[in-house]
Structures are given as structure tokens and as C-alpha cells.
């Protein structure tokens, strides 16, 4: 599939939308190499997806004994980026920033096997490049309504009183309020009558090591009739996703580039499908990239002025997991 500029992507998406032509799309975090193609051509271009049960391939889990080892970056390396972020937070240039790094992993799974075996509502495998098994919606659109479900806050479900711990944690509360406020503001740029329909509800996610709890909220807005005609503009206006950048978005994104020292690429970008009537899309988190023969699991977390470097480093590593169907 040919990569395009963001302007070409917007024009192509608007064109497909006007024609009500189903299409697949993938946009990287930096908005430098967006991909778009008619849905019917996606598989022959090495793109395989399973998005809320809509898929262009046969999902065939082949249970294998799991051999999955993390090779974490040194804490001192993480601390360098964390200190830079804290300096910017102290100056007031950001008040929430999502800091991410890759962790090298080794195991007996290929990208294809991970795609088939993981359990997630939004899955994508781009041949020889990456696999993504995301729990997080970006936006879903149907019946002229647009929905987003920002996800912020996680805890190990096996901890005593885990749900109450998560819901009453002040740092998690502050982060979640910030992201909900940011996403309300984002939706107001493309829609009207914005409402928070559900605030900080709990999702339970299975992993190969047990269960984790995550908090999300549901935000809703009303789009104009024939929103399909501006589908490219709507997506571009909302990028990057607030939950994986921070607030304020533009300045925070600049700080992210300084702290992480490498481009994220398709990690923390978005992907999705337009089926001719509705749109479903996801934030590309829970993401494993392949570079030559090496595999990297990309993860991160929200940093505020109250964050502790050791805690955040451990959270980054805690998120390096595979949500395997049937795990205890």
C-alpha cells in the first residue's frame, strides 16, 4: 500500500466517504505516513484486522506454550526522559504527558501468531512490521453520533481491594479528569451537544499472567448530516489521540519528541475501518514492532508533576503483556 501525505489522506478519505466506499485507514503518531485503501483490497496488501468482530481474515488461534521474556531498558535511561518531562511540567508547559519507550522481548511467537492468539476488541497485523491488540477505542461513529472512550488508569486485579484502590487513587483521578476534559474539547471541534455519558467505569482485561483493571469514560457528541463527506477532516482534527499525548496537546507532543528521542511511528497512532455507513477506530496501543529479527513491545504511562520515576518505570513494564484468550 502506498503511503501518502496527510493532505492526500484527508482528500482520499473524504472522497471514499462521499462515495460511501468502505475503506481501511492507519495513521502514525507523527502524521507522516498515513495509509488508506478500499476495504476489499486490504488483505492483498498485507493488512489484516479484526475490529469489533469485523475482520478481513479467518482468526485461527493455535494455542502454544507461551515463552515470553522481557529485556527492560535500564532505569537510568528511563530516568533521563522522565527528568526532562518533569522539568517541562514544573515550567507549566504541560500538565499531563504520556511517556513511552520500547521494551525488547523474546519468545516463541511470531507477529502472525500474536495476532491470532491475543484477545482484544481492536486487532491489526501489518505484515513484517507490527501487530497491535488494542483495548482502546479512538472514535466510533454511527447514526450521526460520535463516541470516544478515553482509557486512563490501570491496576493489577489481584491486589487487595484493587477496584477501590484504582477508583480512589488521587493521581489516577487527576489524570482521568484531565483526559476526559481534553477529549470533550476535542470532540467539540467536530461535533455539538457534547456529553460525558459514563465517567470512570471499570474494564477487566485478561493477560497471560492474570487480570488487570482499567478505568474508561464514555463521551458523546452529535455530528452534522453527511458527516461521511468530511470523514478525513474529522479524523485529522482529532489527532493525535489525547490519551497517548497529553495536555495541552501541541506543546506536550513537542516535549514527547524531545524526551523519547525517536519517532513512535504507527505506535499510538490510530487505525480503523469505514464500512460505508459507520466508522470504528482504535488507538494503536498494546503494540509489538518487528525490526529485523528483534521484537519490541511499546508501552508507557501518563506523567504528572506528582509522578514518581520508579513507579512509572514499573508501570511501563507492567503493561508489557499479552491478553491471551482463556488466561486465568
From Swiss-Prot:
Coiled-coil blocks: none
SUPFAM superfamilies xref list: ADC synthase
GO BP terms, alphabetized: L-tryptophan biosynthetic process
InterPro entries in alphabetical order: ADC_synthase, Anth_synth_I-like, Chorismate_C
Gene3D superfamilies linked to this entry: Anthranilate synthase
Domain of life: Bacteria
Any one GO molecular-function label of the UniProt entry: 4-amino-4-deoxychorismate synthase activity
NCBIfam families: PRK07093.1
Protein family per UniProt: To the C-terminal of para-aminobenzoate synthase component I.
PANTHER family referenced in this protein's UniProt entry, alphabetically: AMINOBENZOATE/ANTHRANILATE SYNTHASE (PTHR11236), AMINODEOXYCHORISMATE SYNTHASE COMPONENT 1 (PTHR11236:SF50)
The protein's name: Uncharacterized PabA-like protein HI_1170
Lineage of the organism: Bacteria, Pseudomonadati, Pseudomonadota, Gammaproteobacteria, Pasteurellales
